[in-house]
Amino acid sequence: MTSSSTILQRLTQTIEARKSADPAHSYIAKLLSSNEDKVLKKIAEEAAETIMACKDNDREQIIYETADLWFHCLIMLARHDISPEAILSELERREGVSGIEEKLSRSQNQPEPTKAE
């Protein structure tokens, strides 16, 4: 089995390399050069397919569709110059913190909404 960090590094390198590739010859380059809505719609499509695979309790499809979803999320992150390591660091920061506690800390750090006049 390939280590998850190694495959993430290789995929990230491939996506970065495709930033300068010809969109006519590379699916990744095509998505990177398109408007962001196209990438976001693809993520929504893959998320919906993942949800349907879960509802069908189809293990193989869940794995397949989740891989598609993660792949397209990596492309979206590359568009914003965010590395997978930034996401992994955030997950590591949250590790061991209860979901309730983490959510509460987010709400306490939000500015108070202003009243519309």
Curated annotation (Swiss-Prot):
Where are the annotated segments for Disordered? 96-117
Renumbered to this chain, the Polar residues biased-composition regions fall at 106-117
User: Pathway, according to UniProt?
Assistant: Amino-acid biosynthesis; L-histidine biosynthesis; L-histidine from 5-phospho-alpha-D-ribose 1-diphosphate: step 2/9
Q: Where located?
A: Cytoplasm
What are the EC numbers?
3.6.1.31
Query: Which reaction does this enzyme catalyse, per its entry?
Result: 1-(5-phospho-beta-D-ribosyl)-ATP + H2O = 1-(5-phospho-beta-D-ribosyl)-5'-AMP + diphosphate + H(+)
Q: What is this protein called?
A: Phosphoribosyl-ATP pyrophosphatase
Gene source species: Nitrosomonas eutropha (strain DSM 101675 / C91 / Nm57)
Q: Which gene is annotated as encoding this protein in its UniProt record?
A: hisE
